[in-house]
Each structure stands twice: as structure tokens, then as C-alpha cells.
């Protein structure tokens, strides 16, 4: 309970002010975050990393035996609930029933679908049996990655964001599980922390009107690519 209170007051609240308040210094710099990629997922991802480092490995991992998921149907059910709820999370950030909300709704769905397929392909590429767990991890990464970009990109761009972000995050999951002593039980940092990094970079690249590829930049208006990357 104390951790939740401290995280909300000391981490989430300052990030929300910096990013969304008209006087926030990140907002003034031009950083783009449509629905909380930085505010929500960066804070959660890095808090999870800090917790995993502080608490250390579980006993099963100390003995060299990684535990398998307890209940795959519940994983699938939870992913489905996240999928449905994320529509309100992203589309609701348009603050109205309008075209922007519709666009955010669509890009969210397509990014998730692309990331889910990417997770399936990752299993196949590595010679593993295609699993529901891999698809669900990919789906969550797609949702995280599209969160900062949902209202700023097209459907085609959202497909790329979801697919590419899932590949990057699966690489990080592999490194964490096989090359480090960090026991991130639910892969929160790779999915939310790294997924957010990918999403913010792609937002800076693809954002309609102001992105690196599609926007007009001047010496007085730096590219959003670098502004969004600043947070990494």
C-alpha cells in the first residue's frame, strides 16, 4: 500500500504534470504522448525493474528451475480484458466521441493485432511451438507501444509500430531471462518499459504533421523524434 501511494505521488504525478499540463516542461518542449506511454507505462516498467532488482530472484529461479505459467486460460482471459479496456484507455484520451477517438480506437486494435502476430512469428523463428502465451505477450506489447502514438499515426503506421515493438521486446525478454540475474516475473520491464521506449520513438518518427518523416521542422522547432527520445 505504501509503495502504491509513493509511486502515485512521487513518480506518476510529476510525469503527468510534465507531459500533459500546459506549463509542463516536456509539453513545452513538444514531447508527444497521446494516452500515457510515458506517464503510465514508463513509471510502471521502471518501478517493476527496481522492484525486481531489490527483491532478487525467487527460490525456483535460484535453483535453476524457471516456473511455468500457472493457468494459460486465465492469461488469455486477462489479455482479452486488457484488449477491451484499452480501447477506452486510448480512444478516451481524445476526450470526446469524435474522429480522433475513432482513429485512436482503430490504431490501437491494429497495433495489437500486428504485435500478436509478431509474438507468434517469434516463437516459430526460434524453433519453439507456437503458444498462446507468446501471442498474449505480443498483444500487451502492441497495446503499450501504440499508447503514446494512438491519436497521431495512421493504421499502416500502427501496424509497423506493433510488429516492430514486439520483436524488440521479445529480444529484451530473452536477454533478461537468459543473460541476467534479474527475475522479472511477468516481464513487466521488457513489455511496459521497453515497449514504451519503442512507442515514444515511433511516435516521434511517424506523428502526423510533426513527426520526423512527415512533419515540417525548423531550427526553432526540433524534431519530435529527439524530443520523445529525450525521455529514454
What is each PLM-predicted segment?
Residues 1-232:
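Glycine- and aromatic-enriched membrane alpha-helices
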Amino acid at each position: 500500500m505504501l509503495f502504491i501511494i509513493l509511486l502515485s505521488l512521487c513518480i506518476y504525478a510529476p510525469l503527468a504534470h510534465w507531459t500533459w499540463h500546459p506549463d509542463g516542461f516536456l509539453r513545452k518542449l513538444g514531447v508527444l504522448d497521446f494516452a500515457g506511454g510515458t506517464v503510465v507505462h514508463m513509471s510502471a516498467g521502471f518501478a517493476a525493474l527496481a522492484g525486481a532488482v531489490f527483491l532478487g530472484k525467487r527460490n525456483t529461479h535460484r535453483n535453476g528451475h524457471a516456473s511455468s505459467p500457472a493457468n494459460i486460460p486465465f492469461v488469455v482471459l486477462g489479455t482479452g480484458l486488457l484488449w477491451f479496456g484499452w480501447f477506452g484507455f486510448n480512444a478516451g484520451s481524445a476526450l470526446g466521441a469524435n474522429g480522433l477517438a475513432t482513429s485512436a480506437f482503430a490504431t490501437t486494435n491494429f497495433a495489437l493485432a500486428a504485435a500478436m502476430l509478431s509474438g507468434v512469428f517469434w516463437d516459430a523463428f526460434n524453433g519453439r511451438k507456437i503458444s498462446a502465451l507468446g501471442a498474449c505477450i505480443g498483444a500487451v506489447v502492441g497495446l503499450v507501444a501504440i499508447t503514446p502514438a494512438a491519436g497521431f499515426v495512421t493504421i499502416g503506421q500502427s501496424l509497423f509500430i506493433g510488429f516492430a515493438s514486439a520483436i524488440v521486446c521479445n529480444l529484451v525478454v530473452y536477454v533478461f531471462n537468459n543473460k541476467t540475474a534479474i527475475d522479472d516475473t511477468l516481464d513487466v520491464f521488457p513489455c511496459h518499459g521497453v515497449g514504451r521506449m519503442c512507442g515514444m520513438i515511433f511516435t516521434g518518427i511517424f506523428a502526423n504533421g510533426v513527426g520526423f518523416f512527415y512533419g515540417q521542422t525548423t531550427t526553432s522547432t526540433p524534431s519530435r523524434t529527439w524530443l520523445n527520445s529525450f525521455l529514454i
